[in-house]
């Protein structure tokens, strides 16, 4: 009995670890740090910003990762940060990256696949 309980626990743990998102908001912030000046004032988009956008896009391959990235990106368009929401929303396109959802506060990240 104890052995079967242990096996069930390990299977549950493996399932939970396997479905957990590998991307964190810390990772998103790190990848997009070089975008902050551009997101405040516009101008010329820094090459490092586009490199970070591409890196983040390449990391977000699973549904949980995309949903986490979506929620993290939504936090960037929060008016209290002083970033221009329209500029933030346009960064992926300016970098030639197509993401499957708009970056805006109203986006329902639970629907991102």
Curated annotation (Swiss-Prot):
Pfam family, one: Tryp_alpha_amyl
CDD domains: nsLTP1
Keyword Signal: yes
A molecular function GO annotation: lipid binding
GO biological process, one term: lipid transport
Disulfide bonds: 25-72, 35-49, 50-95, 70-109
Transmembrane segments: none
Tissue specificity as recorded in UniProt: Highly expressed in style and stigma, abundant in young leaves and petals, and low expression in young anthers at pollen mother cell stage with an active tapetum. Not expressed in mature leaves or in pollen grains or tubes. Found in the stylar transmitting tract epidermis and in the stylar extracellular matrix.
SUPFAM superfamilies tied to this protein: Bifunctional inhibitor/lipid-transfer protein/seed storage 2S albumin
InterPro entries in UniProt: Bifun_inhib/LTP/seed_sf, Bifunc_inhib/LTP/seed_store, Plant_nsLTP
Sorted UniProt keywords: Disulfide bond, Lipid-binding, Signal, Transport
Family, per entry: Belongs to the plant LTP family.
General function of this protein: Acts as an adhesive agent between the pollen tube wall and the stylar transmitting tract epidermis. Binds a stylar pectin in a pH-dependent manner. Enhances activity of chemocyanin, a diffusible chemotropic factor.
UniProt xrefs under PANTHER family: NON-SPECIFIC LIPID-TRANSFER PROTEIN 2-RELATED (PTHR33076)
Protein name: Stigma/stylar cysteine-rich adhesin
Protein source organism: Lilium longiflorum
Lineage, top ranks: Eukaryota, Viridiplantae, Streptophyta, Embryophyta, Tracheophyta
């Amino acid at each position: 009995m104890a052995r079967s309980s242990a096996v069930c626990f390990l299977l549950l743990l493996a399932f939970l670890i396997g479905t957990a998102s590998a991307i964190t908001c810390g990772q998103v912030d790190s990848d997009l740090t070089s975008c902050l000046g551009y997101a405040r004032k516009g101008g010329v988009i820094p090459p490092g910003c586009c490199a970070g956008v591409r890196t983040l896009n390449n990391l977000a391959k699973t549904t949980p990762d995309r949903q986490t990235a979506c929620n993290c990106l939504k936090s960037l368009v929060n008016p209290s940060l002083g970033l221009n929401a329209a500029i933030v929303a346009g960064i992926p396109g300016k970098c030639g990256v197509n993401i499957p959802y708009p970056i805006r506060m109203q986006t329902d990240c639970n629907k991102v696949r």
